[in-house]
């Protein structure tokens, strides 16, 4: 049963027609032909054996991620801790979420809210990057009155440091402001894709996020696809046609030359 639940997003993705998913008591969400629910792309749940616990000094509360993510997370947090411009300490929190955890998160809001309203704060289960084990939320301590996972994160020096440096450690911001995906701006939510495709584990992460990266670009992003600018077109001018000699003038010149030849004889 657990294995089947992990593959539910894939089954939804290949459905021929839109379906309705019952997520909470009295709340259903329409799943489009492209597999998206309320703007969110489908993702399967990471197998438990592919996740490891992050060291306690990296996170606020329990945090399980792919091991290759933790290696770069350690480097990022160490670099941030050594930079006084951060004005605090960065931590990870809310790392991997199972489908059941995501359902609990999605349904925890007020029962009066519609699925659309709920999706503003949380992705529907089966449609969260957190399920992959490659995504996490960042927070700062001391909090200074800014709750975790709130827009006030963007006003912190720590966020400005992330925006300038996170890509160097393989992290990119999934949901920038005014994103085409139609998902709420989340300055705290970052996914790992590796510093390059050749980095350990990066190829798999980039495969899982390929559609998101292609259709709904992260910003800041890791090695974004270069913009191909077509070469400037230099107009070429056709050579001017050669002027045809005027036959009348040629004959007159020929007659003059003939008279000159006869006089020389």
Task: List where the protein language model places each region.
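N-terminal secretory signal peptides that target proteins for export/translocation
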Residues: 1-4
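Sec-dependent N-terminal signal peptides
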Residues: 7-15
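Extracytoplasmic cell-surface/polysaccharide-interacting catalytic and binding patches
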Residues: 18-95, 99-265
């Amino acid at each position: 049963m657990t294995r089947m639940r992990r593959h539910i997003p894939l089954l939804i993705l290949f459905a021929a027609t839109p379906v309705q998913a019952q997520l909470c008591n009295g709340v259903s969400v329409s799943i489009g032909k492209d597999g998206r629910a309320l703007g969110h792309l489908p993702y399967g749940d990471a197998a438990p054996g592919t996740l490891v616990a992050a060291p306690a000094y990296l996170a606020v509360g329990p945090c399980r991620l792919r091991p290759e993510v933790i290696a770069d997370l350690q480097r990022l947090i160490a670099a941030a801790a050594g930079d006084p411009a951060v004005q605090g300490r960065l931590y990870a929190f809310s790392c991997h979420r199972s489908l059941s955890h995501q359902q609990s998160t999605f349904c925890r809001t007020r029962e009066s809210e519609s699925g659309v309203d709920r999706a503003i704060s949380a992705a529907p289960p089966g449609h969260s990057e957190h399920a992959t084990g490659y995504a996490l939320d960042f927070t700062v301590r001391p909090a200074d009155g800014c709750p975790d996972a709130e827009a006030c994160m963007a006003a912190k020096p720590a966020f400005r440091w992330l925006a300038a440096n996170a890509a160097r450690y393989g992290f990119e911001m999934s949901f920038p402001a005014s994103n085409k995906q139609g998902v709420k701006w989340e300055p705290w939510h970052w996914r790992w894709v590796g510093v390059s495709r050749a980095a350990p584990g990066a190829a798999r992460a980039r495969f899982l996020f390929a559609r998101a990266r292609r259709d709904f670009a992260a910003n800041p992003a890791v090695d974004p696809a270069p913009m191909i600018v077509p070469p400037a077109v230099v107009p070429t001018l056709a050579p001017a046609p050669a002027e045809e000699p005027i036959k009348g003038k040629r004959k007159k010149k020929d007659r003059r030359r003939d008279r000159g030849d006869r006089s020389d004889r």
